């Protein structure tokens, strides 16, 4: 086992604080509407330019291992805030830096670290309750657009696009962000259920001008198996041909003789058929087939539940108003499934979302909810260069997370004002002893830090602005974009309550751990092994001449 380097008490805390400051100073320059850019070097390609706090934090690794531990713990604050609310990473970092700096000063002055932590926790718990009381529901699209605009660094077009997307697909709908092809941002909305599987044979195409298969009021056969023998499908095909409607087959695969026969029947006009593979893999494929069955009012023909394809009837088939299939995607529009069954299925998937542990699973489940509940919107980000595209895409994603958080828990006045108001409301809070009171004061002072940093970034004097804002009440604050005072909510400067709450809670949590740190342990740096060329007696062979 490698030897360890151990530091105690003040030595450890000073090193840790130095690491915290390096990371926080790099992140906090991006805060506010006049936040600066940070340029990140990449080992290949052009450097990345960003104003996204968590992107900056992720890039930072320090050479000194003790300092790096401090930096990594604050990075954890940014990541946690990002995971919980999708935004507020810079605010969380600024809060954490302030609590750690003031807290460590108090520890150095002889205060008890555990009591300080208790005081900080008490203040934060009270602040969270006050934040909830200040929160205003965010329901109309104007408020949603304002939240999106603020989070996208005052880019109004992004705010409007997100509000429009939410109008189209609902609050629960899936909104994804992709690279666009032009200079303008665009919004694409896919109505109905779409999945990433195209036609199995180009011979199914009946709209050559668009290269797509369009089926009007088709029957939909859902099979959880490979279909290679046409005989087992004959009863269904005959029944569909009699009904005079087209048929869409969604199965694990359709191959060989079965596919060839379907193609021939389609080309001869005997029965209009198209076949696609079922979306997903393994258990997820079974679940998605069941989703489609619920949406279209059909049944999944599965041998697991004792159903055979030969015995399938028209009652087992789903139906939809229209189906459009192209090379890569299939879209089912207006399935005839019962609304109650669809809502039941959505509720069931929501329950799974609550229990999901990984982000990937949660995202996939949310996509399934959206496909059942209404549709998917795609925001295509336009930009002149790839560097600008990356930067803008990160901002749009942030704005999207912020608007979701706003719809969930409501909004408070932005620009750091909500925390100032909360701090003034809990200013009389007292702990059980003097050290806890100092902890409460540390937390209250930290709540001013975001406003001060926003003001500093736009080149004004933080103390003057902070005192003016404290002198006002309600939503009165400082608009850093226009450099004027007024009602923040009326000016459209809003922060999602969830973002502000998460930032404060995670900052206090990690800062509390760091204040109560008494010892740090890390591996000693390995001493470089001697160069083999210089080792041994070989280098000294030249001296052998003296032996003669």
UniProtKB/Swiss-Prot annotation:
Q: What is its EC number?
A: 5.6.1.7
Q: Which UniProt keywords apply?
A: ATP-binding, Chaperone, Cytoplasm, Isomerase, Nucleotide-binding
Protein residues bound to ATP: 30-33, 51, 87-91, 415, 479-481, 495
| A Pfam family this chain is assigned to | Cpn60_TCP1
Write out the annotated subcellular location: Cytoplasm
* BP term (GO), one: protein refolding
Q: What is this protein called?
A: Chaperonin GroEL
**What organism does this protein naturally occur in?**
Salmonella arizonae (strain ATCC BAA-731 / CDC346-86 / RSK2980)
The record's gene field reads groEL
